[in-house]
Amino acid sequence: MTKTADAIIIGAGVIGAATAFELNKLGYKTLSIDRNAEAGHGSTSGSCAIIRVHYSTLEGTAFAYEGYFYWRDWADYLGVKDERGLANYRETGCLVMKTSSN
């Protein structure tokens, strides 16, 4: 039996998993390859998982602001009914410090 994939994705962290998810939604068959036994157990697992919209460019800020709405409604975006296993999203606010060097 021969198995084929339309795309091979190296890495199954946040970027690789998101790429595979979006390609699958478009109908592509994907194969994800990662050095770890489970997805998200590389550098993604060490992330502090901060979602922010404060960036130095308008484009970066606009992109992050759009992403905020995906995170806020993550279960709906993924189309899951059972939220077990999903990343918890909690808004806590932030404090941005302005100094003479920034």
Regions found by a protein language model. Give the residues of each.
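Short, flexible hinge/linker loops that cap or flank conserved catalytic cores
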Residues: 1-2, 24, 89
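Dinucleotide-binding Rossmann-like beta1-alpha1 core, especially the glycine-rich loop
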Residues: 48-102
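Accessory recognition modules or surfaces
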Residues: 2-8, 40-47, 51
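Beta1/beta-strand and adjacent pyrophosphate-binding region of the FAD-binding site
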Residues: 1-15, 31
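Glycine-rich FAD pyrophosphate-binding loop
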Residues: 24-44
